[in-house]
Amino acid sequence: EHGYLLDKYTGCKVWCVINNESCNGECNKRRGGYYGYCYFWKLACYCQGARKSELWNYKTNKCKS
């Protein structure tokens, strides 16, 4: 699956500014994906190849912050 990484504590997307390295590390090492980057226009980490449960979904996840 592809999409924005989910912060399971807050229900929000994992935020970033311009740091592809941190998003890629989060995607690869912690979420089982193969490539992650900071999507600049949304200021959120986008991950390719992660499990669906690791990704933010507009319909099912509510941001608490």
From Swiss-Prot:
Citing just one GO molecular function, the answer is: toxin activity
Q: Carries keyword Manganese?
A: no
Q: Where in the cell is it found?
A: Secreted
Q: Which GO terms describe its cellular component?
A: extracellular region
Residues annotated as carrying Pyrrolidone carboxylic acid (Glu) in the record are 1
Transmembrane stretches in the record are none
Please give the residue positions where the record annotates the modification Serine amide.
Answer: 65
Q: Which UniProt keywords apply?
A: Amidation, Disulfide bond, Ion channel impairing toxin, Neurotoxin, Pyrrolidone carboxylic acid, Secreted, Toxin, Voltage-gated sodium channel impairing toxin
Q: Does Transmembrane helix appear among the keywords?
A: no
- What is the first-listed, main subcellular location in coarse terms? secreted
Q: Could you tell me in which tissues this protein is expressed?
A: Expressed by the venom gland.
Recorded superkingdom: Eukaryota
Q: Which cysteines are joined by disulfide bonds?
A: 12-63, 16-38, 23-45, 27-47
InterPro entries attached here?
LCN-type_CS_alpha_beta_dom, Scorpion_toxin-like, Scorpion_toxin-like_sf, Scorpion_toxinL, Scorpion_toxinL/defensin
Domain LCN-type CS-alpha/beta, by residue range, is 1-64
- GO terms (BP aspect): defense response
Q: Hey, which family's this protein in?
A: Belongs to the long (4 C-C) scorpion toxin superfamily. Sodium channel inhibitor family.
What does this chain do?
A: Has a toxic effect on insects and mammals. On German cockroach larvae, it provokes contraction, paralysis and lethality. Intracerebroventricular injection into mice causes severe neurotoxic symptoms. It fully competes with the binding of the iodinated Css4 (AC P60266) on rat brain synaptosomes, with moderate affinity and in a concentration-dependent manner (EC(50)=25 nM). It may act on both site 3 and site 4 of voltage-gated sodium channels.
Task: Read off the domain note.
Answer: Has the structural arrangement of an alpha-helix connected to antiparallel beta-sheets by disulfide bonds (CS-alpha/beta).
Additional facts recorded: Negative results: does not inhibit the binding of iodinated Css2 (AC P08900) and iodinated Ts1 (AC P15226) to their specific antibodies.
Name this polypeptide is given: Beta-toxin Am IT
Please give the organism. Androctonus mauritanicus mauritanicus
Q: What is the lineage of its organism?
A: Eukaryota, Metazoa, Ecdysozoa, Arthropoda, Chelicerata
